[in-house]
UniProtKB/Swiss-Prot annotation:
The gene is asnS. Its EC number is 6.1.1.22. It is found in: Cytoplasm. This is Asparagine--tRNA ligase. One of its GO terms (cellular component) is cytoplasm. The lineage of its organism: Bacteria, Pseudomonadati, Pseudomonadota, Gammaproteobacteria, Oceanospirillales. HAMAP family: Asn_tRNA_synth. It comes from Hahella chejuensis (strain KCTC 2396). It catalyses: tRNA(Asn) + L-asparagine + ATP = L-asparaginyl-tRNA(Asn) + AMP + diphosphate + H(+). SUPFAM superfamilies: Class II aaRS and biotin synthetases, Nucleic acid-binding proteins. Keywords: Aminoacyl-tRNA synthetase, ATP-binding, Cytoplasm, Ligase, Nucleotide-binding, Protein biosynthesis.
Length: 465
């Protein structure tokens, strides 16, 4: 006998009439008066379960089969036959059902066969992948992860594993998780009474990374095209549907490139991501369109088909000021765009993805290249209909004197000595962007809370599991 993934059986990768084995969990069991049980078996390989038809003549029918409830694990062997019912091409006429694991108390099983709120399921995050929604999210997340690496590999990028432990604050926001092996009950102090981090494991104050960008720039200026894809951390005390304390970031960097090259890369990247998920996960996307957001498929198709429209920040401000719409947040040159402004531009004004470029220097990071007007930097945000900003990027400041002036009071130059070295030895124009992976998954699936697109969310007051 051959063990098959259920997805392979439903894709007709086994011949009708052949003997097959599937291993998985019970989604449901229905018994007929004629002494036949219909068991829907799921193994996580695809959205659909496969039906196993079990006759009462099976030796362990009364002892095992009639004890099966939602969540029980089992191994089914039988003959693959064409399904006489609608909705599935094949089913299994079982010749053997092996009960592997029972659910102790079916009445209190937290994810029994009924619909639960996502808030409830966050409290049982160890069991929620057994539900339709979180199984689908997991498969989409996997598909997108593979698509990230495939896209960059095909484009000639090198994958750089940037450090999780760092002494740098790339964003300058100060929202850092400190890492220490010091005895909290007996902290060493300096003469001035401050904590003496020279006695710590790394000999200095150390944090969890907020971004791999600064590190990946170093490799960009040797390898030309690089990217990092890994976990990042923000100690931002924010309990919103858009924030996580631990999340994954995709950060490519390209040498000999300006802001337009960066925008081109971002557009190609997003189109590839969305096309892959539409092609490979149509079953899961159909579920999201039916149960989560009816627009998820059409808006991804829109992102794939339509050219991204580029608008200068100053032009965007004029559009918003003259559109006649009353916004909650003020629209003024020098202020950052809020989500409501971004969505108006993408959804109402353009009706397509928008890339806003050249933002005021005061609202952007020190490493972004100062434009000739001395007022703006070569920064961009990619705005997607239905969510607003999905990518943020910039051309990097490659001139040491300008970089030093931009660093100013935000950072200590001595801490960034190695980053400044990159401008001293063979500096070139280069650019890159950052994309929060969970925000991408939320956009693709229509899930409204990023806590529901990562296996075990880390948020303020929550590090369970």
């Amino acid at each position: 006998m051959t063990h098959y993934a259920i997805s392979d059986l439903l894709k007709n990768k086994a011949e009708i009439g052949s003997e097959v084995t599937v291993k998985g969990w019970v989604r449901s069991r229905r018994d007929s008066k004629a002494g036949v049980s219909f068991i829907h078996v799921h193994d996580g390989s695809c959205f659909d379960a496969i039906q196993a038809v079990v006759a009462k003549e099976l030796p362990n029918y009364d002892a095992d089969v009639l004890r099966l409830t939602t969540g029980c694990s089992l191994i089914v062997t039988g003959t693959l036959v064409e399904s006489p019912g609608q909705g599935q091409s094949c089913e299994i006429q079982a010749t053997s059902v092996e009960l592997v694991g029972l659910v102790d108390d079916p009445e209190t099983y937290p994810v029994a066969k009924k619909r639960h709120t996502f808030e409830f399921l966050r409290g049982v995050a160890h069991l929620r992948p057994r539900t339709n929604a979180f199984g689908a999210v997991t498969r989409v997340r996997t598909t997108l992860s593979h698509a990230v690496h495939h896209f960059f590999y095909e484009q000639g990028f090198q994958w750089i594993n940037t450090p999780i432990l760092t002494a740098s604050d790339c964003e300058g926001a100060g929202e850092l998780f400190r890492v220490s092996t010091l005895d909290m009950a007996n902290l060493p102090k300096t003469d001035s009474g401050k904590i003496d981090y020279s006695k710590d494991f790394f000999g200095k104050e150390t944090f969890l990374t907020v971004s791999g960008q600064l590190n990946v720039e170093a490799y960009c200026l040797a390898m030309s095209k690089v990217y990092t894809f890994g976990p990042t951390f923000r100690a931002e005390n924010s309990n919103t549907s858009r924030h996580l304390a631990e999340f994954w970031m995709i950060e490519p960097e390209i040498a000999f490139a300006d802001l337009n090259d960066d925008a081109d890369l971002a557009e190609r990247f997003l189109k590839h991501m969305f096309k892959v998920v539409l092609d490979e996960r149509s079953d899961d996307m159909a579920f999201f369109a039916e149960r989560i957001n009816p627009d998820v498929v059409s808006r991804l198709e829109n992102m794939v088909d339509k050219e991204f429209v580029r608008i200068d920040y100053s032009e965007a401000i004029k559009i918003l000021q003259n559109c006649g719409k009353k916004f909650e947040y003020p629209v003024q040159w020098g202020l950052d765009l809020q989500s409501e402004h971004e969505r108006y531009l993408a959804e109402t004004h353009v009706g397509a993805p928008v890339i806003v470029m050249n933002y005021p220097k005061e609202i952007k990071a020190f490493y972004m290249r100062l434009n000739d007007d001395d007022k703006t930097v070569a920064a961009m945000d990619v705005l997607a209909p239905g969510i607003g900003e999905i990518i943020g990027g910039s051309q990097r400041e490659d001139r040491l004197d300008v970089l030093d002036a931009r660093i100013g009071d935000m950072h200590h130059k001595e801490e960034l000595w190695w980053y400044r070295d990159l401008r001293r030895y063979g500096s070139v124009p280069h650019a890159g962007f950052g994309l929060g992976f969970e925000r991408l998954i939320a956009y693709v699936t229509g899930m409204e809370n990023v806590r529901d697109v990562i296996p075990f969310p880390r948020t303020p007051d929550n590090a369970q599991f």
